[in-house]
Design a protein with these regions (language model features):
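A short, Lys/Arg-enriched amphipathic alpha-helix from helix-turn-helix/homeodomain DNA-binding modules
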Residues: 11-23, 74, 123
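Hydrophobic/aromatic residues within well-ordered alpha-helical segments
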Residues: 13, 56, 63, 67, ...
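Helix-turn-helix
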Residues: 16, 24-58, 62, 66
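Amphipathic alpha-helical packing segments from all-alpha helical-bundle domains
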Residues: 69-72, 76, 125-152, 161-165
Length: 216
């Protein structure tokens, strides 16, 4: 996984620890993953570990933050005022959904998303608060897009903050469904989310997805 640059000479050392932890958590294992196993895989010392992280929980939260930032940066491009072609809010919303389903359906990223949602990660002290911050950061681009639509009348019924939560929650539900592992179901799931979003935002029927895409 491409790491968020640390800007420090020891950044490669930190990245090896993070990547090794992702590997250890993703592979089948019994019981919790011990720091010693992570260090052995990363080929670093305990001193190196504690130079970057105060504890294993701190490492886990850093991993969550790294995955969140990679996703958020990709989504921010769509909501940026200087986005190529200056697309209208509806085009931006559709592009945001496209990006979410493309990113989360990729084999590599799906692996990292699975790890940050695993039971051991969830047990880390501070995980719940960090996960909420992650949600807000990831959805900030969607909030911005909905606010654009409210301002120009594209989304007359939107309440940007609450609608972003609802739309993102449905995206997450679709992406964690067993159906998403069938490539043919990815566009179906994506269009299902779009239809829900456009109804909630008050978009006229002419802009809704063609009903033919509802076929299961």
């Amino acid at each position: 996984m491409q790491s968020v640059p640390s800007g420090q000479p020891s950044g490669d050392e930190r990245d090896r620890i993070v990547e090794s932890t992702f590997d250890c958590l993703f592979e089948p294992h019994q019981g919790p993953v011990h720091v010693s196993a992570i260090l052995a895989r990363a080929e670093v010392s305990s001193r190196a570990f504690y130079r970057h992280f105060e504890s294993k929980d701190d490492l886990f939260l850093a991993m969550l933050g790294q995955v969140t930032e990679l996703l958020a940066v990709a989504l921010d491009e769509i909501a940026a005022p200087d986005a190529p072609g200056d697309p209208d809010p509806l085009s931006r919303l559709r592009a945001w959904l496209d990006r979410m389903f493309t990113l989360a359906s990729s084999t590599e990223l799906h692996r990292y998303l699975a790890v940050v949602d695993c039971d051991e990660m969830r047990s880390a002290k501070g995980y719940r608060e960090a996960r909420e911050q992650s949600r807000v950061r990831r959805e900030s681009s969607l909030v911005a897009i909905l606010a654009m639509g409210l301002a120009d009348g594209s989304f007359p019924l939107t309440e940007p903050e609450s609608d972003a939560i609802a739309i993102a929650a449905l995206v997450s539900r679709e992406l964690t469904s067993a159906r998403i592992y069938d490539p043919a179901q990815v566009p179906v799931a994506r269009d299902r989310v779009e239809r829900f979003a456009l109804r909630a935002l008050g978009v006229v029927a002419a802009n809704t997805v063609n009903s033919d895409t509802t076929a299961q």
